[in-house]
């Protein structure tokens, strides 16, 4: 596990304690009991792919630990509208405050502005956060294999599905992938960024794709910058993408998405 991930996870444990002191778990559970159905994140991804289109998870991200502020002029609702117009299948919204300058409010703003399913992009390590995601209005959560033990993976994914949330399980190497496929969720993300060096190579996805069961949707994450990158993936039967920074640096994120994935149409 990388030093930055260790630091983030230690902070998450404190954050859960702080938040549960303000809003007790029992209250969250009660609030999660009578909510509208989620929008169907995995189903939307599968439908895009079945139609022959790339399934694009477009990320709403202000900053990152490695790059600092990526988009100073940051308006989640406007970004969400732009992404939907540009052809995104789903959204990913950063809610981590301390390391990514995210906010729960950003998720609400983005989701309220569009009809797309939304992933809560955060470091989920505790059942409290799963209930919290459902109450916030998320349609899907992220579980990072390198941050969790097998029992946690099973428990958190099981709870999410029980609450009607989809789960994107993220891996970085073959060992993590072997652990991820034990969890019965349809979405497996392969992050092309090395957690130790922060280097990005698309070869990570290409090397691992054959080990992903055919009944799962493989989502390639990080490093998709050019139409050639997209074509490389699609020619290798990788049809789902999570892209953030490339779009966040563009004046019009949705137009950047359209140019990257649909300009040939």
From Swiss-Prot:
Catalytic activity: 1-(2-carboxyphenylamino)-1-deoxy-D-ribulose 5-phosphate + H(+) = (1S,2R)-1-C-(indol-3-yl)glycerol 3-phosphate + CO2 + H2O
Pfam families on file: IGPS
Database matches in InterPro entries: Aldolase_TIM, Indole-3-glycerol_P_synth, Indole-3-glycerol_P_synth_dom, Indole-3-GlycerolPSynthase_CS, RibuloseP-bd_barrel
Gene3D superfamilies from the UniProt entry: Aldolase class I (3.20.20.70)
Cysteine pairs bridged by disulfides in the record: none
EC number: 4.1.1.48
Record keywords: Amino-acid biosynthesis, Aromatic amino acid biosynthesis, Decarboxylase, Lyase, Tryptophan biosynthesis
Stored CDD domains: IGPS
PROSITE patterns recorded: IGPS
Range of residues in the leader sequence: none
A single GO BP: L-tryptophan biosynthetic process
Enzyme class: lyase
Pathway: Amino-acid biosynthesis; L-tryptophan biosynthesis; L-tryptophan from chorismate: step 4/5
GO molecular function per UniProt: indole-3-glycerol-phosphate synthase activity; phosphoribosylanthranilate isomerase activity
Annotated family: Belongs to the TrpC family.
Protein name: Indole-3-glycerol phosphate synthase
């Amino acid at each position: 596990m990388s030093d930055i991930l260790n630091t983030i996870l230690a902070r998450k444990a404190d954050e859960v304690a702080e938040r549960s002191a303000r809003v007790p778990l029992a209250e969250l559970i009660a609030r999660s009991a009578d909510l509208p159905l989620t929008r169907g994140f995995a189903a939307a991804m599968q439908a895009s792919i079945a139609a022959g289109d790339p399934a694009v998870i477009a990320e709403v991200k202000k900053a990152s630990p490695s790059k600092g502020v990526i988009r100073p002029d940051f308006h989640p609702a406007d970004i969400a509208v732009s992404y939907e117009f540009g052809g995104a299948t789903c959204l990913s919204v950063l809610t981590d405050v301390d390391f990514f300058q995210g906010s729960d409010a950003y998720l609400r703003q983005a989701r309220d502005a569009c009809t797309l399913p939304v992933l809560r992009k955060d470091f989920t390590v505790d059942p409290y956060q799963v209930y919290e995601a459902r109450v916030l209005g998320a349609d899907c959560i992220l579980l990072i294999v390198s941050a969790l033990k097998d029992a946690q993976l099973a428990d958190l994914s099981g709870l999410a599905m029980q609450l009607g949330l989809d789960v994107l399980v993220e891996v970085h190497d073959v060992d993590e992938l072997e652990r991820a496929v034990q969890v019965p969720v349809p979405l497996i993300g392969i992050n092309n960024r090395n957690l130790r060096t922060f280097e990005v190579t698309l070869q990570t996805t290409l090397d691992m794709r054959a080990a992903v069961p055919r009944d799962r949707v493989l989502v390639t994450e990080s490093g998709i910058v050019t139409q050639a990158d997209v074509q490389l993936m699609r020619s290798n039967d990788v049809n789902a993408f999570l892209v953030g920074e490339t779009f966040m640096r563009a004046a019009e994120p949705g137009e950047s998405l359209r140019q990257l994935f649909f300009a040939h149409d």
